[in-house]
């Protein structure tokens, strides 16, 4: 958080929070996103219900003006829609939704509006397509389609998360050391 001193009131912050950070949370951001819920950190949480409830804290304290973005392709995540108070956008790689979605021929839309091609996304992996669908749903109406496309084409990802290291003898090497659970490590290989 070395940039905290440079943050102005009109700036927007994007923060990824773990279940450990969310478990005691009693306030929610204006925009909340849950990409996927799967059995993670069950060595710390007493059971899956505790883990899911911790994650849901990100949206439970929103008001009627809040925006929640959920993955329609993940049943546990989609079920969180029952707990939202404001506008809820669903995103999907498989079917049309009220948020961002990807068609079978690789076109990305928000509702009925075409945005870009899936192939425009520079960073590899179907999970990154889902991340873009979530991000588009989170910023729709506040960020132009042109900016969304530019970011997709130019963003190289974040350090330690499927970070391209080099290509040697036809093999592409990636650093995915941030993957802290088996499911995250497996997703990074797809």
Residue locations for each model-derived region?
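Acidic, Mg2+-coordinating active-site environments of NTP-dependent enzymes
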Residues: 3, 7-10, 29, 34-173
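Hydrophobic Walker B segment
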Residues: 26
């Amino acid at each position: 958080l070395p940039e905290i001193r440079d943050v102005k009131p009109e700036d927007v912050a994007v923060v990824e929070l773990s279940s450990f950070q969310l478990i005691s949370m009693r306030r929610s951001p204006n925009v909340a996103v849950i990409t996927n819920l799967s059995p993670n950190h069950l060595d710390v949480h007493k059971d899956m219900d505790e883990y899911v409830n911790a994650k849901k804290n990100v949206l439970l304290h929103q008001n009627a003006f809040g925006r929640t973005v959920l993955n329609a392709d993940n049943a546990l995540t989609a079920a969180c829609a029952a707990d939202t108070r404001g506008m809820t956008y669903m995103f999907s790689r498989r079917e049309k939704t009220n948020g961002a979605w990807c068609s079978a021929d690789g076109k990305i839309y928000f509702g009925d509006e075409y945005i870009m091609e899936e192939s425009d996304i520079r960073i590899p992996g179907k999970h990154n397509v889902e991340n873009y669908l979530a991000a588009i749903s989170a910023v729709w109406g506040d960020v132009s389609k042109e900016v969304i496309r530019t970011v997709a084409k130019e963003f190289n990802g974040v350090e330690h998360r499927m970070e391209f290291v080099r290509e040697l003898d036809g093999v592409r090497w990636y650093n995915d050391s941030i993957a802290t659970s088996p499911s995250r490590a497996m997703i990074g290989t797809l």
